[in-house]
Amino acid sequence: MMQGALVLSLAAFIAKILSAVYRVPFQNMVGNTGFYVYQQVYPIYGIGMTFALSGFPVFVSALIAQYRSDYELLPLLKRLFWILSGLGLGVFLILYTQSELIASWMGDALLSSVIQSVSWMFLMMPFLVIARGYFQGTNRMVPTAVSQVMEQVVRVSVILLAASFYGSLTNDLYEVGTWAMSSAVVAAVMATFVLLYYKKSDSFENWNGSRVIEPHKIQWGVLLKRLVIEGGTLCLLSSILVLFQLIDSFTLFKGLVEQGMSQEVAKDLKGIFDRGQPLVQLGMVVGVGFSSSYLPLLSRSYTKQHLEEFEQLKYSLLKMTMVFSVVATVGLLVILPRVNHMLFGDIQGNDVLSIYIISIILASMMMAYHGILQSTGKYSITLIALLIGLIAKGIGNLWFIPQFQTLGASIATILGLFVMLGMIWILSGGKSSSNHQKSTMIKLGIVSIGMAIVVGGLNILFERYFPAGDSRTKDTLLALLLVSVGIIVFIIGAIRIKLFTIREWLMIPKGKSLLRFTRKWKKRGEKDEIR
């Protein structure tokens, strides 16, 4: 089971990287306005993705684990399939037939065809949910993991192919956006084929338990209620950041236009604002990776009531997440203009993005807390915090966008995440910092400030001869150089002030090699002193 959980975590990690990276070439191909078109509708895809991958399949797998030893599950799964089919068909019909209304709520009627394009993926949802839940419920995680990675690879390929047609086959960015969103259903079909391939060697006949459940005893109402409450909660908790983006889709562009801004300028500014999402995703990669790798360890220690080990793992996860999210944020802030130019071709929106990327820290810590609560089955805390955080984000957008435009949306995002993180901390019985935690924060502050001084100092020096925004090639080379310097400074500083324990170093990729290297380095230094 542990190995299976790690396989799923690795697949999720790979999918996160793919999901963050493809947006850069896509934006380069279609520009700010094309990126705006795609990002306006992306949250709908993101919600559908959580339905088919990390929300309902987890619910189905839990249902299988609960009933497998007592009943034949085929009738149960059939009813679940029909309920999910009704849900998927309902969402599809709403999105497809009401696409013009939804587009008008977003403030851009031309988005209608893009919304219709993404709606088709919901018809594939029942197949993916039942198949993934089936395999996960029988502790076979490889089919789900492979289907997830293949789904992302196919989707990214179709999106970039669609973007490549801009300027040759069409000059209509909304048409490109429609093609790009069709990647969702193409990828879902591919994922279904992958799952069917694994299903070939299996049979539902093996699912018979000690007795056969009678169809009338599988109550439709009970299944529907559990699917909505338990499955719906899992879906909401798996789409935290996507829901924040959905609020921006309905309020930011529309809010800018209502303030008297032309639609073309508003689209351009929204496209620049949306650059923050891949930056935040990349900044969160390490933190999310730790959350994924710690989750099975936390679940195992809590289930076996090894509470001391659980507390150690909990503290270690929060510490590692805080360290890497803070370092990533500080590093990005120091060299943001060069990174902006390197990735997106210009240095527009640095002020907006500099606020937005602070969410790397808040979102990473929030996901870490969510992982801890998930391992103990305390979903209600995160759900309450999420709802309050979304309300804060929505009110923040309505309040700040008229005053500060896209900068206001960035501020509202930070506000919403901060409120949510604070609510999670309070509701989970937040305690005052121990001396050990204070020591960690002091050490983290020293390392972060030291890194910022070294990297920032070099950047100021380079700015005299190679101003940011002057040459994309130079900014790319300098950004990569400064990132490398920052990593080296962080590693040396972390080792010198003993920021991590040996066990924590071993949890870091290549951490064991780093420890060996530093030990050899210390021994050589001692020999030189003796001489």
Which ranges hold each PLM region?
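Specific pore-lining/lateral-gate transmembrane helices of multi-pass inner-membrane transport
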Residues: 65-81, 268-355, 361
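N-terminal membrane topogenesis motif
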Residues: 1-18, 215-241, 504-531
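Membrane-interface junctions at transmembrane-helix termini in multi-pass inner-membrane proteins
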Residues: 126-147, 358-387
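C-terminal transmembrane helix end/exit motif
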Residues: 162-166, 182, 186-216, 417-465, ...
